[in-house]
Amino acid sequence: MSAALPTSSREWHLVARPHGWPKAEDFALREAAVAAPAEGRILVRNKYFSVDPYMRGRMNDVKSYTPPFKLDHPMDGGAVGEVIASNAEGFAVGDHVLHGLGWREIADVPAKHAVKVDPGLAPLSAYLGVLGMTGLTAYAGLFDVASFKEGDAVFVSGAAGAVGSQVGQLAKLRGASRVIGSAGSDEKVKLLVEEYGFDAAFNYKNGPVRDQLREAAPDGIDVYFDNVGGDHLEAAIGALNVHGRATICGMIAQYNATEPTPGPRNMALIIGKRLRLQGMLVGDHADLQPKFVEEVAGWLASGELKYRETTVEGIENGYDAFVGLLRGENTGKMIVSLA
């Protein structure tokens, strides 16, 4: 047990449920007391925590696949840090762990919910992204849910984000015939082609997605990885070839909508083309974790898989990081650094 534990920790609370776009007054950065960990628990000084699109849904008081954040309680999410006190077998002071109690400086974590990580294998922040839940989402969504096979043509929306950029690269590494991505700026489009190896990419703000996708994929697509929804999903349904598959991972285009969003107008095409559209939650694919880490760590070590992070410094900027993510201000994984 460490002798000089901190006595307090700052943590972000949700204090009001956002209507539409989250506002600064919906959140509060508060101070909480820190105590020595009880039996079976560890105290972790967080070095990095993750902000993710799914968290917007947890701010609504609706029944969903994961419970909503409680008002006036600390929010949570992926975090990685260093053990500063342990009252659990198998964990020692100085160990680095991945856990689910982000949005705070010091986390009191049940040891059974912490996983040791190796800072020698990859930077600690990578365990929140390319080697973490984000990476497993890309890996499982492409290979398991979409049943990707060599020779498939793949379209990825939100392709410059943490999940999308990895999906496109994984498809290329496994032999895709063509990989197309959409992004929200010309700079991101250039990044997709020049750094991540996409065969084609377009800025969805420069014209109808349907037209730009048709130009980028004249022979159609076999797999669509959806991070956006809306007009991207409609365009993909139009471009998918017979027996095409779509992984529906996210719909960031409508997370802050205050009215019901219109559905794709071409759903009837699903019948004639015999398409398969399947939603995914990464938690259903935990069995792939060992294979995923082994394969992706190898591609990282060889330099074949590239990734970027957008890092916001300081816990006091957690709200800004989250809203920036929803606005698409990040390239790759959005992370808050407390290091």
Where are these regions (language model features)?
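Glycine-rich phosphate-binding loop and adjacent beta-alpha segment
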Residues: 192-193, 231-305, 311, 339
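Short amphipathic alpha-helix with an adjacent loop that forms part of the alpha/beta core around
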Residues: 208-219
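C-terminal capping/lid region of NAD(P)-dependent oxidoreductase domains
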Residues: 2-12, 304-311, 319-339
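Mid-domain Rossmann-like dinucleotide-binding core that forms the NAD(H)/NADP(H) cofactor-binding site
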Residues: 128-207
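Short glycine/proline-centered loop/turn elements that form peptide/ligand docking sites
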Residues: 86-90, 181-189, 205, 209, ...
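A short N-terminal beta-strand-loop micro-motif at the entrance of redox/enzyme domains
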Residues: 2-4, 17-47
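Glycine-rich beta-strand-centered segment in the early N-terminal region that forms part
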Residues: 33-51, 59-103
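NAD(P)H dinucleotide-binding glycine-rich loop of Rossmann-like/cofactor-binding domains
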Residues: 70, 75-82, 92-158
